[in-house]
Swiss-Prot record:
Origin superkingdom: Eukaryota
Coiled-coil intervals: none
A single GO molecular function term of this UniProt record: glutathione transferase activity
Record-listed glutathione binding positions: 14, 41, 55, 67-68
EC number: 2.5.1.18
Reactions listed under catalytic activity: RX + glutathione = an S-substituted glutathione + a halide anion + H(+)
Organism: Zea mays (Maize)
Protein name in the entry: Glutathione transferase GST 23
PANTHER family: GLUTATHIONE S-TRANSFERASE, GST, SUPERFAMILY, GST DOMAIN CONTAINING (PTHR11260), GLUTATHIONE TRANSFERASE GST 23 (PTHR11260:SF760)
InterPro entries the UniProt entry points to: Glutathione-S-Trfase_C-like, Glutathione-S-Trfase_C_sf, Glutathione_S-Trfase_N, GST_C, GST_C_Tau, Omega/Tau-like, Thioredoxin-like_sf
Family stated for the protein in its record: Belongs to the GST superfamily.
Alphabetic keyword roster: Plant defense, Transferase
């Protein structure tokens, strides 16, 4: 039985949705998950997020919260007694938010052209993405996780890289996160994906691979 009033409106292949699931699982919160067909959005989704009409949406006691990073912070604030997601120190919290925003604004944008480009354009996109990830990697120096000795807010925000990027690399033939170029990031991939709470929420890799292959073919033929 899911905890009263806790529901996640998501989409199985969305790396933004999995952030919410990881946060809830780390906190030990049971929830109902509703997988949305984004080509035919449900009345529930449109009612709970009429502004952007996007997933994820967390519905808690009938009140909707949208946008994945905002939802993760909300979860940490509501279920205070569980696993700490945000750092306790104000400065460390600010740093975590800074790097999360950097990853959202810069790294995500740098990675997308790899998926949509070929040839020289793709090689340029790979280089630019690697430079962005190298900057992000500095936040890992001397640490096991971005959160320190344990997974924290920034790990949750960028955690999708560990599962989705290898899929994107296979689909596109590009090599982005390598031991040579991004050794700390590559090692973190392994540590992060080894965690039971992380693995439990991951979408099936073969299904994700097939979906991304189909999507890329569609984009390249457009």
């Amino acid at each position: 039985m899911a905890e009263k009033g806790v529901k996640v409106l998501g989409m199985w292949a969305s790396p933004m949705v999995i952030r919410v699931e990881w946060a809830l699982r780390l906190k030990g919160v049971e929830y109902e998950y509703v997988d949305e067909d984004l080509a035919n959005k449900s009345a529930d989704l449109l009612r709970h997020n009429p502004v952007t009409k996007k997933v994820p949406v967390l519905v808690h006691d009938g009140k909707p919260v949208a946008e994945s990073t905002i939802i993760v912070e909300y979860i940490d604030e509501v279920w205070k007694g569980g696993y700490p997601i945000m750092p306790g120190d104000p400065y460390e919290r600010a740093q975590a938010r800074f790097w999360a925003r950097f990853a959202e604004d810069k790294c995500n944008a740098a990675l997308y052209p790899i998926f949509t480009a070929t040839g020289e354009a793709q090689r340029k996109a790979v280089h630019e993405a690697q430079q962005c990830l190298k900057t992000l990697e500095t936040a890992l120096e001397g640490k096991k996780f971005f959160g320190g000795d344990a997974v924290g807010y920034l790990d949750i925000v960028v955690g999708w890289f560990a599962h989705w990027l290898p899929v994107i690399e296979e689909v596109t033939g590009a090599s982005v996160v390598t031991h040579e170029e991004l050794p700390l990031m590559k090692a973190w991939f392994g540590r992060f994906l080894a965690l039971d709470v992380v693995k439990a929420a991951l979408p099936d890799r073969d299904r994700l691979l097939a979906a991304n292959k189909a999507r890329r073919e569609q984009l390249l033929s457009a």
